[in-house]
From Swiss-Prot:
Xref: SUPFAM superfamilies: GroEL apical domain-like (SSF52029), GroEL equatorial domain-like (SSF48592), GroEL-intermediate domain like (SSF54849)
Annotated region described as Disordered, given as residue ranges: 527-558
Organism whose genome encodes this protein: Schizosaccharomyces pombe (strain 972 / ATCC 24843) (Fission yeast)
Lineage: Eukaryota, Fungi, Dikarya, Ascomycota, Taphrinomycotina
Compartment(s) where it occurs, according to its Swiss-Prot or TrEMBL record: Cytoplasm
Chain positions found as Phosphoserine: S176
Protein name in the entry: Probable T-complex protein 1 subunit eta
Length: 558
């Protein structure tokens, strides 16, 4: 029963909170994601453009890698940040297809925008998109070609074709033959049961040509800081015992938190003698193990360096933790945090150890490692930005080759797979009734953005080529795709434009989840940034400082 009085408004959110809801907010979220798609879509494909980005520190990055671009874009719109997440997830999961997943997600939202403007419930669109995505993934499993990797003679050739497809869209496409061989060799070096890509190290050495890059079948890392006496140490061993430590072998003055009170000069001398005895006992214990190569995360000082040099032992301190961990995994043994009770099982070994000059740097190389199969790619190039882009390109190619080995299933690239899925979903949509027919047809149209964008980026007539592709797929040519060489249409499977099927499946599922997530949001609540307390202006009045501090920490005595 109403008493007729004015209703008092209930304030739930803090004053200053930005609260936007309704169809207008949903369209705003869609438009933000479409704007991000428009930024990155020009980088798609072998003839896509590169982006030059300058961060807040003035560092320059040149790349056409989707995950790198999305990471460096300073996106502030909360909905558009979802596209950054799916690009990172695609890069972490399969390594390639990061640009495609963002472009496809943006196109799904572009198609959905028309339905939202017409007042269609977003939940109906979500249901249609999810059904279409599942149908597309099932179709990929149906049409994917199984590679016969049992023949070692054909194995390398098949993997090379997969790697070259990933390379052709990168900055190093002119040298793709050289780097493709390096990538395939690197992946085949790994344990084929595990295929752990973390066992492939990548080191960058500025200077020289790209063809000066090399593959080391073992562990390699840059020479660490060394002290006097290092020059006398041997730089080459065969079958050495290797000891890895997390121990500091250095005499240094303790400046902080140190106080010694002595009554006699002899007492001070006893302290100094004890320090020398401690470090010499550590060095003697290391020599007694029979190790010829000693590595440590912590510094190895000049005294220890000269001590080891006199006994024909190589040492390196301040070794990076990731490099030392790779050495331990490759040569065996374990990292010791003490120099006492070191046994034979704690030591590793390899066929050869060598310190070699590469460009302007010296590298420590461990080759012929028995415990774990590992390798290191040493990249050369003129500019730091170029070498960094080469590293990103090789990472993508390594992941592609890894998934081709693991799953043995490939599909044709160049938009062929997307066009076949689009035809399949378009035909399927005609067999059902109701609004779901429109949503599945919209999903089918969205898939065509990949071949269309490939044509646009290459300067081709996208309308003409897409019409030809539709005709070819209607005739049953399911591997017909964009031919970048002849500006036309070709059977991309016969042209060896191959991609692992997992790249396509993961991209479709990730893009669909991102699009449906955006469509499910009907309200955005943005809290006002908290204000930092302002310091009082001018000098404090007498006694004010004591009053401010009163009550902090322990209570003041009464």
């Amino acid at each position: 029963m109403s008493l007729g009085g004015p209703q008092i408004p209930v304030i739930v959110l803090k004053e200053g909170t930005d609260d936007s809801q309704g169809r207008g907010q949903l369209l705003s979220n869609i438009n933000a994601c479409v704007a991000v798609q428009d930024t990155i879509r020009t980088t798609l494909g072998p003839l896509g453009a590169d982006k030059l980005m300058v961060d807040d520190r003035g560092e320059v990055v040149i790349s056409n890698d989707g995950a790198t671009i999305m990471k460096l874009l300073d996106i502030v719109h909360p909905a558009a940040k979802t596209l950054v997440d799916i690009a990172r997830a695609q890069d972490a999961e399969v390594g390639d297809g990061t640009t495609s997943v963002v472009v496809f997600a943006g196109e799904l939202l572009r198609e959905a925008r028309t339905f939202v403007e017409d007042g269609v419930s977003s939940h109906l669109i979500i249901r249609g998109y999810r059904k279409a995505a599942q149908l597309a993934v099932n179709k990929i499993k149906e049409i994917a070609i199984h590679l016969d990797l049992s023949d070692e003679g054909k194995l390398r050739d098949l993997l090379t074709k997969c790697a070259s497809t990933a390379m052709n869209s990168k900055l190093i496409r002119s040298n793709s033959t050289f780097f493709t061989k390096m990538v395939v060799d690197a992946v085949l070096t790994l344990d084929q049961e595990d295929l752990n890509e973390n066992m492939i190290g990548i080191k960058k050495v500025p200077g020289g040509a790209m063809e000066d890059s090399l593959l080391v079948k073992g562990v390699a890392f840059k020479k660490t800081f060394s002290y006097a006496g290092f020059e006398q140490q041997p730089k080459f061993f065969k079958n050495p015992k290797i000891l890895c430590l997390d121990v500091e072998l250095e005499l240094k003055a303790e400046k902080d938190n140190a106080e010694v009170r002595v009554d006699k000069v002899q007492e001070y001398q006893n302290i100094v003698d004890a320090e020398w005895r401690i470090i010499f006992s550590k060095l003697e214990a290391i020599v007694a193990t029979g190790a010829k190569v000693v590595l440590s995360k912590l510094p190895i000082g000049d005294l220890a360096t000269q001590y080891f040099a006199d006994r024909d032992i190589f040492c390196a301190g301040r070794v990076a933790a990731d490099d030392l961990n790779r050495v331990v995994q490759a040569v065996g043994g374990s990292i010791q945090s003490t120099c006492s009770n070191i046994e034979e099982k704690h030591l590793g070994t390899c066929d050869t150890f060598e310190e070699r000059q590469i460009g302007g740097d010296r590298f420590n190389l461990f080759e012929g490692c028995p415990k774990a199969k590992t390798c290191t790619l040493i990249l050369r190039g003129g500019a730091d930005q170029f070498i960094a882009e080469v590293e990103r390109s090789l990472h993508d190619a390594i992941m592609i080759v890894k998934h081709a080995l693991k799953n043995n299933l490939v599909v044709a690239g160049g938009g062929a797979c997307e066009m076949e899925l689009s035809k399949y979903l378009r035909d399927y949509s005609l067999t059902i009734s109701g609004k779901q027919q429109n949503f599945i047809a919209a999903f089918a149209r969205s898939l065509e953005v990949i071949p269309r964008q490939l044509c646009d980026n290459a300067g081709f007539d996208s309308t003409n080529i897409l019409n030809k592709l539709r005709m070819q797929h209607a005739k049953g040519e399911m591997w017909a795709g964009v031919d970048m060489d002849s500006e036309g249409v070709a059977n991309n499977f016969e042209k060896f434009v191959w991609e692992p099927s997992t790249v396509k499946s993961n991209a479709i599922l990730s893009a669909t989840e991102a699009a449906t997530l955006i469509l499910s949001v009907d309200e955005t609540i943005k809290n006002e940034p908290s204000q930092q307390p302002q310091a009082p202006q001018g000098a404090l009045p007498p006694g004010a400082a004591n009053r401010i501090m009163r009550g902090r920490g322990r209570g003041m005595p009464r």
